[in-house]
Amino acid sequence: MDFLNYPEPLADLITGLSRLPGIGPKTAGRLAFYLLQQPQVAENLAETMIRAQREIRQCSLCCNYTDHDPCPICTGEKRERTLLCIVEQPRDVVSLEKTREFKGLYHVLHGVISPLEGVGPEQLTISKLLGRLEGVQEVVMAMNPTVEGEATALYLSRLLKPLGIKVTRIAHGLPVGGDLEYADEITIARALEGRRQI
């Protein structure tokens, strides 16, 4: 998008907004003009972003985002401390918590192993993970079913199995209400692998 006719601060705002995931130049332009027309909304948004940037940090135990360290999940008295779920991103913890099914602890990797993007195990929080395994009996791998997610799960399972820890993987398969006819072969194969007795 050509920003030459815009004043520099407006062009910079559009450029900044377009750097956000899922926001293209046209949407960024619409958002920028909206924010200019709604100064109170813009001011509140700016204050909220600055506050979040200032107050949110990684939990020293699980690496999830929190405003208390350690986070409420890690300090929760009703949590099953022998069960640890490894996820890619903090938003994955939110998704799993919404189900109210998982009662253990979490560990957030903040990414996956991706050699093409220059991300190796040392760029993830694996060293912190290895330092908190005392008393853990089972680790649940909850990475996304991507090539990188699978590679990360395999890498971690090779590290954890020699320690005598049971390593499991969440099942992947058909969504509720999904039709077999529209599912790809990998999804159907995973659904068959993850089948259980009824």
UniProtKB/Swiss-Prot annotation:
Zn-finger (C4-type) intervals are 59-74
Question: In its keyword annotation, does this UniProt entry include Zinc?
Answer: yes
Q: Known Gene3D superfamilies for this protein?
A: 3.30.60.80, 3.40.1360.10, 6.10.250.240, RecR Domain 1
The entry's keywords: DNA damage, DNA recombination, DNA repair, Metal-binding, Zinc, Zinc-finger
Single GO MF annotation: DNA binding
Query: Is this entry keyworded DNA damage?
Result: yes
Q: Which GO terms describe its biological process?
A: DNA recombination; DNA repair
Could you tell me which PROSITE patterns the record lists for this protein? Answer: TOPRIM
Could you tell me which residue ranges the Toprim domain spans?
82-175
Q: Which residues form a coiled coil?
A: none
Q: What does this protein's UniProt record list under function?
A: May play a role in DNA repair. It seems to be involved in an RecBC-independent recombinational process of DNA repair. It may act with RecF and RecO.
**In which family does this protein belong, per the annotation?**
Belongs to the RecR family.
Question: What NCBIfam families does this protein map onto?
Answer: recR
What name is this protein filed under?
Recombination protein RecR
Tell me what organism the protein belongs to. Answer: Desulfitobacterium hafniense (strain Y51)
Its encoding gene is what?
Answer: recR
